[in-house]
Design a protein with these regions (language model features):
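Domain-level signature for proteins that mediate thiol-based redox and metal-cofactor handling
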Residues: 3-105
Length: 105
């Protein structure tokens, strides 16, 4: 049902808020690094995300953390994390909270 999918979506988003960028002390959701979060019928999850900088030395770690934490959410059966740098991330993608926290506002 849609209700179930919405619940799952919210739960995954919560979990993603516990993943932090190594360079900036803000979680990847508020930073705007998660471009797309799709939750499919059978608990299949697709995440399209970026990093603040291409060639980030811990890129693999962040992707692995996203994968592991999402897989651990009850109801999730499959997780596909795709890393992209198109479009490249910029500060405008951050939430207002993140901008405030970092003093950009």
């Amino acid at each position: 049902s849609n209700f179930k999918l919405n619940m799952l979506y919210n739960e995954i988003e919560e979990v993603l808020r516990s993943v932090y960028d190594p360079e900036i002390p803000v979680n990847i959701v508020d930073l705007g690094l998660v471009y797309k979060l799709e939750v499919g019928e059978a608990g299949k999850v697709k995440i399209i995300m970026t990093l603040t900088a291409p060639g980030c030395p811990v890129a693999g770690d962040i992707v692995a953390e996203v994968q592991q934490k999402t897989e651990a959410v009850e109801g999730v059966t499959d997780v596909y994390v795709h890393l992209t740098f198109d479009p490249p991330w910029n500060r405008e993608m951050m939430t207002e909270e993140a901008k405030l926290e970092l003093g950009f506002l």
